[in-house]
């Protein structure tokens, strides 16, 4: 959805609940309710193995879960990825085929590559390179930028900063802040120092439950043992 159309239509609200998942008899997710709206960056924190990736997969529709409900403005959309222009998803593993050039990948996603990389001039000489020829960090950065600039109402990012050079992490975070004006972002990353300053809302996955943290988020994270005192 274009920025003009979004402003005219008002914010869209993505909600997910009813998600219960067990692995090997261990309940990974229960009592889950999550809300993201356009114009927001929402952070999803939790320890390794807490179910962050599974939750993103379920919201996107890549993982079928009985009784899971994903809604946009109250309308059920399961699987959500089939809803044109609704959302895209960057998993932890590489998303795009390594044989694709950057230019071809951008065309497939309907993204203006010049615009998407405007703050990363060092990527310009690599437009005709295959994604598999890039460094791990550059490939991750490019894929995050392409999904960020793609014309969807929401973007789900699982560890978007992983492997990205620190100087690029800062600029990518600034790009996210800028583009949240026209879409909603749901981000999970173990690098809480980069994620927390970005977020309008923070959720914590703790012992299978999804907790919305209000007030002093860092203090609450310390209380739950997520951050050192």
Which ranges hold each PLM region?
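The feature captures the beta-strand-to-loop junction immediately N-terminal to the Walker
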Residues: 45-47
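ABC ATPase NBD coupling module
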Residues: 63, 74-88, 222
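Walker B catalytic motif
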Residues: 159-160
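Conserved ABC nucleotide-binding domain
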Residues: 116-136, 151
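Conserved beta-strand-loop-alpha-helix hinge in the C-terminal portion
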Residues: 209-229
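Q-loop/switch helix immediately C-terminal to the Walker
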Residues: 93, 98-113
């Amino acid at each position: 959805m274009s920025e003009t159309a979004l402003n005219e239509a008002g914010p869209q609200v993505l909600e997910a609940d009813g998600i219960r998942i067990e692995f090997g008899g261990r309940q990974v997710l229960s009592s889950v309710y999550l809300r993201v709206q356009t114009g927001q960056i929402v952070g999803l924190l939790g320890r390794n193995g807490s179910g962050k990736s599974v939750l993103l997969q379920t919201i996107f529709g890549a993982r079928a879960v009985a009784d899971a409900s994903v809604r946009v403005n109250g309308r059920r959309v399961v699987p959500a990825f089939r809803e044109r222009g609704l959302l895209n998803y960057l998993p932890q593993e590489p998303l795009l085929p390594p044989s694709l050039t950057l230019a071809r990948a951008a065309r497939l996603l309907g993204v203006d590559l010049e615009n998407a990389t405007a703050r990363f001039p060092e990527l310009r000489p690599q437009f005709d390179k295959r994604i598999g020829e890039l460094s791990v960090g550059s490939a991750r950065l490019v894929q995050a930028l392409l999904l960020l600039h793609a014309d969807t109402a929401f973007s789900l990012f699982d560890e978007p900063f992983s492997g990205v050079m620190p100087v690029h992490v800062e600029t990518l975070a600034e790009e996210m802040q800028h583009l949240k004006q026209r879409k909603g972002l749901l981000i999970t990353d173990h690098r809480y120092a980069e994620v927390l300053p970005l977020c309008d809302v923070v959720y914590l996955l703790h012992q299978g439950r999804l907790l919305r943290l209000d007030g002093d988020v860092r203090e609450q994270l310390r209380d739950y043992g997520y951050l050192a005192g």
